[in-house]
């Protein structure tokens, strides 16, 4: 039933403290990604990260948490693979760079830094109730804005399929 057999990795980013609406969005995104056989990668802690992992696990998905500290027990209960880094917020770089697409849900300045890393690395970024950018007073539409969890996941998967990291992963598994 897992269409993509976990080769595709999509990062879901957002705040460690989030609204009930963002929690529900993240959980639904996790469920939908797992149903498509996508590996979910995130910062491994609470809030949006916990909700997306909980959603993914409820549908039998695979979750990876890139942790800021030295201790794997800091990971939320729904992380399958906790990656201990000891590098604090610098862990935002591998969260994003490991993925073929990124879904941002809400978020504070940590999420904004991840959005910037994704844009700089040409990794497609889909936004649900998240930051908007402007440059010289002009709207910068680099973040692909969507209105629902379903739209976010559909868009992320279709863009991830065209990303160079995914093409390499699919070749390796043949």
Range-by-range predicted roles:
Residues 137-142:
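Acidic, glycine-centered active-site loop in nucleotide-sugar glycosyltransferases
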């Amino acid at each position: 039933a897992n269409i993509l057999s976990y080769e595709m990795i999509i990062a879901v980013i957002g705040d460690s403290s989030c609204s009930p609406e963002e929690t529900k969005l993240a959980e639904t995104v996790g469920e939908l990604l797992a149903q498509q056989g996508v590996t979910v990668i995130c910062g491994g802690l609470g809030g949006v990260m916990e909700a997306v992992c909980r959603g993914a696990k409820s549908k039998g998905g695979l979750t990876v948490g890139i942790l800021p500290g030295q201790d794997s027990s800091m990971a939320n209960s729904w992380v399958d693979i906790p990656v201990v880094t000891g590098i604090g917020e610098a862990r935002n770089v591998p969260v994003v760079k490991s993925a073929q697409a990124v879904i941002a849900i809400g978020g504070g300045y940590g999420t904004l830094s991840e959005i910037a890393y994704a844009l700089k690395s040409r990794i497609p970024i889909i936004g649900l109730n998240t930051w908007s950018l402007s440059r010289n007073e002009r709207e910068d539409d680099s973040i692909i804005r969507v209105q629902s969890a379903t739209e976010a996941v559909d868009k992320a998967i279709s863009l991830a399929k065209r990303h160079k990291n995914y093409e390499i992963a699919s070749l390796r598994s043949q």
